[in-house]
């Protein structure tokens, strides 16, 4: 049974003193041995973390006791291994970056649609279905007949709307994303632009996969996630994709057989895009990763003090073994 609980959470809420939450939240996560990243901003909280069930329960209880963070939206999935290396709490201008001033999901937002009602909505021929995620996410899975805006970042989404959608022509627009947070902003943006009937999938793709049976599902492929699992299947288990550590693109086993694929250095997606300087840096990073593995240490995101302590204990154990051997010879 998978013993690592992965928790994706967010909440749009006014947090005028969000900076003061960072240290106590980080301390709580470190004490509970929770890894992952949470973002704090004046507009709320967002992120994905992982730990034991008890640790995640403790985190959710802690957040529920903070003014404004009660009843936070979260989705759980499971993994056999810890999908994160670090524990981080970052202070940001936005908890999901669209880059458009004045968009506030607390004031105006699209109509939430439950996973159980989603199929009926997107099967309506009058509904335009738009995937708000980035192109590399869409490539490995999306809903049947969904439009791919082919964006590299969420900042590009407003330009896509301006160039391709018209409130006079597109009367009904439905949108979706991984966990729901990008749709909060995208639907708020469309409402501000004059679109009247705007819908979004409540809880995002992850909630849909959790609640809708696979035989009834209109989801095709796997769902990209922002952790070391890379993607999850319809059962929310780790999927078939790996990830290029150079460009972060999801890659298949077939792509890993390509001459362009060098572990940690390049893949077919980025071989022609990285500079010689980047390549040298990636080669050195991979060397450090392999060196850390040979010492049975985690490289990326390891707590330096933990690594030093592990080395000290190893040396001390070797010293004691040597002393015992010398004593036996006497």
Curated annotation (Swiss-Prot):
Q: Name one Pfam family in it.
A: UPF0176_N
Q: Name one GO biological process term.
A: tRNA modification
Tell me the Gene3D superfamilies matching this sequence: 3.30.70.100, Rhodanese-like domain
GO molecular function of the protein, one example?
oxidoreductase activity, acting on paired donors, with incorporation or reduction of molecular oxygen
Do the record's keywords include tRNA processing? yes
This protein's superkingdom?
Bacteria
* Coiled coil segments of this chain: none
What are the protein's UniProt keywords? Answer: Oxidoreductase, tRNA processing
Write out the catalysed reaction.
Answer: uridine(34) in tRNA + AH2 + O2 = 5-hydroxyuridine(34) in tRNA + A + H2O
Family annotation (PROSITE patterns)? RHODANESE_3
Which Enzyme Commission number(s) are on file for it?
Answer: 1.14.-.-
Ranges of residues in domain Rhodanese: 123-217
Which CDD domains does this entry report, sorted A to Z?
A: RHOD_YceA
Which residues act catalytically here? 177 (cysteine persulfide intermediate)
Known InterPro entries for this protein?
A: Rhodanese-like_dom (IPR001763), Rhodanese-like_dom_sf (IPR036873), TrhO (IPR020936), TRHO_N (IPR040503)
HAMAP family noted in UniProt: TrhO
> What is the role of this chain?
Catalyzes oxygen-dependent 5-hydroxyuridine (ho5U) modification at position 34 in tRNAs.
**Alphabetical list of NCBIfam families matching this protein:** PRK00142.1-4 (NF001136)
Can you tell me which family this protein belongs to?
Belongs to the TrhO family.
Kindly provide the name given to this protein in its UniProt entry. tRNA uridine(34) hydroxylase
Q: What is the lineage of its organism?
A: Bacteria, Pseudomonadati, Pseudomonadota, Gammaproteobacteria, Alteromonadales
